[in-house]
Amino acid sequence: MSRVANSPVTLPSGVDLTLNGQTVVVKGGKGSLEFNIHTSVQVSKEENVITFAARDGAKQSRALAGTTRALVNNMVVGVSQGFEKRLFLQGVGYRAALKGNVLNLSLGFSHPVDYELPEGVTAECASQTEIVIRGIDKQAVGQVAAEVRGFRPPEPYKGKGVRYSDEVIRRKEAKKK
């Protein structure tokens, strides 16, 4: 069984954490994030160290304590360093362009795909076939990357589609007569 909740979260310099009842607010150089903690999780702050514990010994409470610790740690990393996901477009004529807050994608369809970026997430087109998605909320960055990838997931025969930078596509051999 994992013991994630037992390890404390250390706040780096420039990051401030505020506890208001069951609400945690993390402020840093890149912005601020807010999170509501479940009632079965107890959070305590001593100087720049935050500890998490289950209020009772129930299995669900211990699991929630570990999940809460991981989420708060992601908030601390997000407001201090930020998160980014890189996507590559692979295929003939596949390209991406950013117009304001709208990501314009040509993915081999008969129509262009326009994706409006949500608040708190920014994108940058390093080249016509590379998209870098950045933000302070790890979940939002991952969700945007997954939605963009979902427009044209990589296919196993030629490898065409939108893929993550660290994703390896298992290739298949075409059927032969």
From Swiss-Prot:
The family this protein is said to belong to: Belongs to the universal ribosomal protein uL6 family.
GO CC terms of this entry: cytosolic large ribosomal subunit
Zinc recorded as keyword: no
Subunit structure: Part of the 50S ribosomal subunit.
BP GO annotations: cytoplasmic translation
Disulfide bonds: none
Molecular-function annotations in GO: rRNA binding; structural constituent of ribosome
Protein name as annotated: Large ribosomal subunit protein uL6
Pfam families: Ribosomal_L6 (PF00347)
PROSITE patterns noted in UniProt: RIBOSOMAL_L6_1
Reported function: This protein binds to the 23S rRNA, and is important in its secondary structure. It is located near the subunit interface in the base of the L7/L12 stalk, and near the tRNA binding site of the peptidyltransferase center.
Keywords for this protein: Ribonucleoprotein, Ribosomal protein, RNA-binding, rRNA-binding
SUPFAM superfamilies referenced in this protein's UniProt entry, alphabetically: Ribosomal protein L6
Gene3D superfamilies: Ribosomal protein L6, alpha-beta domain (3.90.930.12)
Entries under InterPro entries matching the protein: Ribosomal_uL6-like (IPR000702), Ribosomal_uL6-like_a/b-dom_sf (IPR036789), Ribosomal_uL6_a/b-dom (IPR020040), Ribosomal_uL6_bac-type (IPR019906), Ribosomal_uL6_CS (IPR002358)
